[in-house]
Design a protein with these regions (language model features):
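Catalytic alpha/beta core domains of metabolic enzymes, predominantly
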Residues: 2-127, 138
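Flexible, glycine/charged-enriched surface loops at secondary-structure junctions
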Residues: 41, 155-164
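Positions that flank functional sites
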Residues: 46, 130, 167
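Short Asp/Glu-rich motifs
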Residues: 50, 134-135, 171-172
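Substrate-binding groove of N-acetylhexosamine-processing glycoside hydrolases
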Residues: 89, 164-169
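C-terminal helical cap(s) of enzyme catalytic domains, especially alpha/beta-barrels
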Residues: 133-157
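Acidic/aromatic/glycine-rich contiguous surface patches that form carbohydrate-binding/processing clefts
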Residues: 145, 149, 167-173
Length: 175
């Protein structure tokens, strides 16, 4: 139903995540053809503008779902001022978009809290972070999800049920 779409390239510490414009447009066309909703991955500000341009060209249908990826070396730092700026730009460019921020590694929990506070969605799990806290490894994805779910109450937020999540993301209901 969904797949990641990075709308530009980024220099990772040991390699280049290469996504030239013609490749990105081809992926967007294929996703549109097969009814796959892109999760726009934003590793730098230009990727947000690239996504807006793809939407203007009709290669991505709205409302978009955008994920800011914070805390990877050579990309966006996990700083609150950067997070706030990205949200501000998103609201100006794509006001109907849903959004989430992913904090990698030691930044995951802090970025989760920023998202809850600012009205965004939350991403958690072992793909981005192996630790439950500074003192120990997470036992499972479920443990990390439970940590975020428990935190929702403190921000007057609730955990979406699958049908609600599909609706929020603009996905067809599951059969």
């Amino acid at each position: 139903d969904m797949a990641s779409l990075a709308t530009g390239s980024v220099n990772f510490p040991t390699n280049i995540y290469e996504n030239p414009p013609d490749f990105v447009e081809g992926l967007a066309r294929s996703m549109l053809e097969y009814g796959i909703k892109p999760e726009i991955e934003v590793f730098d500000l230009a990727m947000l503008y690239n996504a807006a341009n793809l939407a203007k060209k009709g290669l991505i249908e709205g409302p978009l779902h955008v994920q800011f990826v914070l805390g990877i070396a050579n990309a966006l730092p996990a700083r609150r001022s950067v997070f706030d700026f990205l949200r501000s730009e998103l609201l100006q460019l794509l006001p109907d978009a849903s959004w989430v921020a992913a904090g990698t590694g030691r930044f995951q929990w802090e970025v989760n809290q920023w998202c809850l506070e600012a009205g965004g969605h939350v991403r958690t799990g072992l793909e981005d972070n192996l630790k439950f806290d500074a003192s120990r490894l997470a036992a499972s994805n479920a443990e990390l999800v439970a940590k975020v779910a428990d935190a929702c109450e403190g921000y007057d937020r609730h955990v979406a049920r699958p049908a609600e999540a599909r609706q929020l993301l603009g996905l067809a209901m599951a059969a």
